[in-house]
């Protein structure tokens, strides 16, 4: 069932109508300006004797995918299960009060505008009562668990035990399963709790280890050719087996974009010239791995960013009274995690003066759904030292999450929003289902990133530069690098990032009338299915969270009741591997002139930290005008500004809808806040392995009896499996908002100007 969120963008007037002391959440600091006048007083909801013999089942507290898998064996009762989180349920009264407060915090006309909470104030007003927490904690201890502590938000109890205790207390068996060819641990059925506790407990986050994937492409390594100003990238061995129709002329190699290029494309160069670099703003990147700090220094030096004064800190965040974040130590100097590298280097690329925190916790210390990433994020949000901005480049579809894990994510981002933290999340890297990064959609239908479908974060999708497929590279890029290896001349037209034959722009560039015709022809070139892919920016509707009011009001907003993603998009990758960004790593350092092999990479794991960097520039610009630097969730303001530029959900759109079309490039878009991406789609290939796998939301156009996956049917993702066209493909770009690219990309300089006007400062 969808949770009804009342996050009305109030600025749009029509829309606003018995444990150790250290283990407990810290005491509240009293009423703040934000909570003044809000009635959240309530009595304990645990009013009956807690009897473990009288239980109630909590729905959706096991993974649905487990029902399709066969258990290989039971988990041994003595197997430890550390740092599980019991997720609590706030009352309807407090939920409504929180929704109203967050709306007011984003309303420039409200006395509560930008009046942010501390974690303690949040817990005092919107958490579960101390009496109810004591009742739940006492029951956990009676079952033999160790209660490690209660978070300041009074919504999470961290506890540890073993599989036998979980079976006995929650009436579910922990098993080993093989899911998507990987070994996992998960509970076999929904859990049960004493009926007396049912009203205050959602479930347990930590009963499975199906964790999300980092949303980046596999790194490619190229050698720089000074003659072509491109990187020569080795072709896969399978390419020699048959010619591929993806062989578009990519001008003798791959292009490696650098910070200068992104600054030109997205207008941050103008902000740098005015002294706005992100100085004084902190961006936290939540990770489950680490990197070599010297690689960040290498990146900053290579691309001329040192003088801006940004800083880099690698840390393990701990909430007050907790020690559950363990350092994911690098075993050897060269064992960089490319997710960490990409996030750290490219958030700095956009905000070269910002303070970058790489906040990482090891997965090995927790069984919970999002492992170290979840621990890092929730510890930051409940900690003493909090960032202005968080970027999370991880994801999995909602179909791969359980109710407790999804609720934990949503309450975490709502708390961040109420505290003023802006959260950005990658949409995913596999088209209409974000769970297949680096693989092919198989056995499931349309889905959305569970880590991003909260209405309290901003989801960032992926785009591709259109110049190569359009044959307009000379118009937008210089033929030679400048001193910092940049070549972009201006904004470059964008299309959705899509590396499959479902890319209509690529199909037409290759002479096909439609992507479907291209895909059918493709089968003749690829009888073994080596080039079948679902790699693309992701987007789709939530099956859990309801659409917030601010998302309904922009032109072409989906006419559904779901929280839809993405919200915005920035460069993520390229068709045919023609364009990537450069990262500097221990084994592949960046050298003057790129004399050695260089790492090239992409994904929405690039897009999210880049937008976080842009937000840092916005924050600094607003702080310079006397406003709080922290802005909370960016999405409500972004949609309000988009409504001005694209028009509302009713009536004729303004002339700026056409004027701000990304296809116009730099011509006529100089005053636009958004670049509206209107060509292409994120519809990708999907497969159905015969005879046992059923893949919904897939229009099948052919079969490969001898593919490397065995006999398969091959199709394109769609919202109607019986037909495939511009209306049914999942999903097409279009004017206004779309599942393919949200509101599009931004001009950061114009965004700051419009944001200032929105909050009534000059």
Feature names for model-found ranges:
Residues 1-25:
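Gram-negative bacterial Sec-dependent N-terminal signal peptides
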Residues 26-150, 158, 163-460, 509-510, ...:
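Substrate-binding/charge-relay-adjacent region of secreted/lumenal peptidase catalytic domains
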Residues 71, 489, 619-733:
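An often Trp-containing, charged/polar helix-loop segment at the C-terminal end
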Residues 323, 499, 517, 582, ...:
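Extracellular secreted precursors and ectodomains with disulfide-bonded cysteine-rich loops/domains
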Residues 436, 453-527:
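Polar, glycine-rich mid-to-C-terminal structural blocks
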Residues 612-620:
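Short glycine/serine- and small hydrophobic-enriched flexible loop segments
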